[in-house]
């Protein structure tokens, strides 16, 4: 990739031209120290006016930065042969109002003739001005309002207004605009608040509910709370779904070894013994309890058998050790006590 950079000699010559006479101010708005140029007209313009020229189209005008862009030799020659003062005199001699919008001022037969004149001057040719019988420069003022409405807002604010007057009017205009925008924002947020008050409270905002602040979540509906407690063993769940409640109780017992029989007896069996004896429970409830008891007895028998085998192996290993006699005897007593306690639990279930 080639190393592109601005020719320092070209930039120096352009900066020197910019400091001569009328070139010190923008051709269109009069802003001081213009840093852009339109080579087709050989004039110096400011940054904002350069943006307007860019929107006119390259067939009318194109712009270059006198410090950041590279100029072709013929473009640099047009800047040297032209200038803001010759262009101003040409417009005035042909009754072109300098305060007209750029679209009107540079897109007409008089402006085209000046570009042709500048080209002939650079090429050492004789310029012959053409006659435009159907063109009336005085009618450009009547069409300027229509052209201004199609021009960007920056152009409208700059047309025919001295720079000093615009700067002095800026604080008041900005203050009025800020007050109007503030009132508009307050009305908008007040309308949002009214709409939020009409939203339901039991739904999240994503589903059309009310916004209640950052981090807030609506309370769970009653059916969700009841669904969360349906997995626990309680009197209400047992009455509503006896078979499902006992099945869930059996699953909890099978998955957690630390869940003792006393917990199941206290939470499920004892509260319903009286209802069982009085015949208030249905036949489905009795069948569910019988199935639960049978599964519990089978699993508990298997567990007791496995535990007995474990204790036998533990006893055989303990007899081979002569250094832990007293400790082993104490462990035997704890195991026997646990066996008796498990047998008592099994007897309770058989009685039930």
From Swiss-Prot:
Gene Ontology terms: biological process: actin filament organization; COPI coating of Golgi vesicle; endoplasmic reticulum to Golgi vesicle-mediated transport; Golgi to plasma membrane protein transport; mitotic cell cycle; retrograde vesicle-mediated transport, Golgi to endoplasmic reticulum
Sequence ranges of Low complexity compositional bias: 138-151
GO cellular component term of the entry, any: endosome
Disordered as annotated region, ranges: 138-181, 196-231, 315-352
Keyword Zinc: yes
Gene3D superfamilies tied to this protein: Arf GTPase activating protein
Single annotated GO MF: actin binding
ZnF start-end (C4-type): 26-49
Residues that bear Phosphoserine: 157, 168, 260
SUPFAM superfamilies from the UniProt entry: ArfGap/RecO-like zinc finger (SSF57863)
Biased composition, class Basic and acidic residues, residue ranges: 331-343
Protein's cellular compartments: Cytoplasm; Mitochondrion; Cytoplasm, Perinuclear region; Golgi apparatus
Keywords: Cytoplasm, Golgi apparatus, GTPase activation, Metal-binding, Mitochondrion, Phosphoprotein, Protein transport, Transport, Zinc, Zinc-finger
Pfam families referenced in this protein's UniProt entry, alphabetically: ArfGap
InterPro entries: ARFGAP/RecO, ArfGAP_dom, ArfGAP_dom_sf
Superkingdom in the source lineage: Eukaryota
Domain (Arf-GAP): residue spans on this chain: 11-127
Entry-annotated residues carrying Phosphothreonine: 151, 161, 170
Compositionally biased tracts (Polar residues): 168-179, 315-330
Role: GTPase-activating protein (GAP) for ARF1 and ARF2. Involved in intracellular vesicular transport. Required for transport from the trans-Golgi network. Implicated in the regulation of retrograde transport from the Golgi to the ER and in actin cytoskeletal organization. May be involved in the maintenance of mitochondrial morphology, possibly through organizing the actin cytoskeleton in Saccharomyces.
Extra remark beyond the main annotation: Present with 9560 molecules/cell in log phase SD medium.
Protein name in the entry: ADP-ribosylation factor GTPase-activating protein GCS1
